[in-house]
Amino acid sequence: MSSLAVRDPAMDRSLRSVFVGNIPYEATEEQLKDIFSEVGSVVSFRLVYDRETGKPKGYGFCEYQDQETALSAMRNLNGREFSGRALRVDNAASEKNKEELKSLGPAAPIIDSPYGDPIDPEDAPESITRAVASLPPEQMFELMKQMKLCVQNSHQEARNMLLQNPQLAYALLQAQVVMRIMDPEIALKILHRKIHVTPLIPGKSQPVSGPGPGGPGPSGPGGPGPGPAPGLCPGPNVMLNQQNPPAPQPQHLPRRPVKDIPPLMQTSIQGGIPAPGPIPAAVPGPGPGSLTPGGAMQPQVGMPVVGPVPLERGQMQISDPRPPMPRGPMPSGGIPPRGLLGDAPNDPRGGTLLSVTGEVEPRGYMGPPHQGPPMHHGHDNRGPASHDMRGGPLAADPRMLIGEPRGPMIDQRGLPMDGRGGRESRGMETRPMETEVLEPRGMERRMETCAMETRGMDARGLEMRGPGPSSRGPMTGGIQGPGPINMGAGGPQGPRQVPNIAGVGNPGGTMQGAGIQGGGMQGAGMQGGGMQGAGMQGGGMQGAGMQAGMQGASMQGGMQGAGMQGASKQGGGQPSSFSPGQSQVTPQDQEKAALIMQVLQLTADQIAMLPPEQRQSILILKEQIQKSTGAS
């Protein structure tokens, strides 16, 4: 007894008492006391009565002086027959007898645990999972809604509730997984994190954070499992409860590796809860429409680029989605429908849009990646161009230079490339690099075959320029005009329709557009033909050299102004060829002539550094100029 005296009074009493069940309703405490005193001295015997009716419930408790006597009573009196009933004698500390013993004094009411039957902590996770899974969807939703309101309205109270009832927190977490509110993997991470932290707080915290929006405070869903605590030992029970969700999972993992939390989560997952992984953002638009560094969407190749100039080409959408190669942003406005150098399937440049993207029309993209060292050295002379080449030294990626000039695009050509409008980005734009530059037909074989056919540079070639200079004045029309520079047709290019050029025969070789567009000097000097805006920039001299050389429409105006050596050649060689507007040399023509001269001044080494097509285009250009000069 002395050893027992130090124990908790309630615990000591439970150990010295026995539970007596199946007692006849007519039996009295005195009769029962006499029977149980057979094994030892009985301190007290109490029958339990219904509080409302006052009738006996059919069971009671017998308290002995020591635990040994109580154990003897359980061994000897269990099954003892009394008034036709076999008495059931058991340990008073088991099951709900604990609650009864606590209030053993005066008419203590029987207290049923609100958590349900006690459960081994090791089985708590599975029990909670089953409880949550058994809830109808409507009830689960209602519980989660209530819990959300509870958290929003009484944050601290909700937190304390979950901390004190970890089984509830775990149930809410499980419910979120079942309802697909939370990814099972995230739930598992939360549980493991809890484990690593202090079991109580982490476990609670985790559910709190996760379940915040979750299930109702009611212990219903998961409460039953882990929460048998209210019994005699509230302190220990609480600890167990708190640890239950986390403890079983981490602590029992060795014993029940799968059963623990992971299994629960797995079960919920099996239930069909798809792990809510982040939804990958849809790829914006078709490949061609990738965002350029500026953030603007690059027009898709297939789309008519004409409208979207918003995208500053100057930005040089090097990030063409398709080809890794940096291409200038496709000019939104005047991309030739197709005839870019890059278009040609056999275009050796490989950087051409077509070769890179394949299905994408070259015009969709400004130009193939610059090839060869930028030979822009000649640009500067071009006049206003020094800065316009995208503001960067021409040395920069030729494409960038040419294409970039998003600004007024004062293309070095001196023409406000911006104005080019038609030429738009193409001429100087990043597009210059665009295959359009050496539109297949321009610099391509056609260019070779008859691209710069004598006629191309011929009086007619210059002639086309006649209308060209004026119309192309702004370069907008001249270079490819707002409309696509249809190099292929060789017909009059948009605004700059040069009937003669169109007639010039080789559609590819004609000087359509501003220069030898068809011939390879389309737009701004072989723009379409091969010196796209930047003078072969895209296809021909994509490098800065040709860019500057052909860019400003150097080939275009150059052929006219320079090729024919200003107005003198023009009038002398084929006065009739020039259109009426051509009779007088405009500043633009002079600038073009200067650009052409720059291209012609490229050294053999510089020309050798260019891609084959570009090299050939320049050679053809020189040859045509020589012929034109000789003819004049």
From Swiss-Prot:
Region (12 X 5 AA tandem repeats of G-[AT]-G-[MI]-Q): 508-565
Known tissue expression: Expressed in testes, where it is restricted to pachytene spermatocytes and spermatids, and in the brain (at protein level).
Gly residues composition bias: residue spans: 519-543, 558-574
Function description: May play a significant role in AAUAAA-independent mRNA polyadenylation in germ cells. Directly involved in the binding to pre-mRNAs.
Region (Disordered): 201-296, 365-433, 519-590
Ranges of compositional bias, category Pro residues: 213-233, 275-287
Phosphoserine carried by residues: 579
The entry's keywords: mRNA processing, Nucleus, Phosphoprotein, Repeat, RNA-binding
Example of a GO biological process term: mRNA 3'-end processing
Domain RRM residues, every copy: 16-94
Subcellular location: Nucleus
Sequence repeats: 428-432, 433-437, 438-442, 443-446, 447-451, 452-456, 457-461, 462-466, 508-512, 513-517, 518-522, 523-527, 528-532, 533-537, 538-542, 543-547, 548-551, 552-556, 557-560, 561-565
Biased composition (Basic and acidic residues): 377-390, 420-433
UniProt gene name: Cstf2t
8 X 5 AA tandem repeats of M-E-T-R-[AG]: region residues: 428-466
Cellular component per GO, a single term: nucleoplasm
Top-level taxonomy: Eukaryota, Metazoa, Chordata, Craniata, Vertebrata
Protein name: Cleavage stimulation factor subunit 2 tau variant
GO molecular function: RNA binding
Pfam families: CSTF2_hinge, CSTF_C, RRM_1
Domain of life: Eukaryota
Biased composition (Low complexity): 234-244, 365-375, 544-557, 575-584
InterPro entries: CSTF2_hinge (IPR025742), CSTF_C (IPR026896), CSTF_C_sf (IPR038192), Nucleotide-bd_a/b_plait_sf (IPR012677), RBD_domain_sf (IPR035979), RRM_dom (IPR000504)
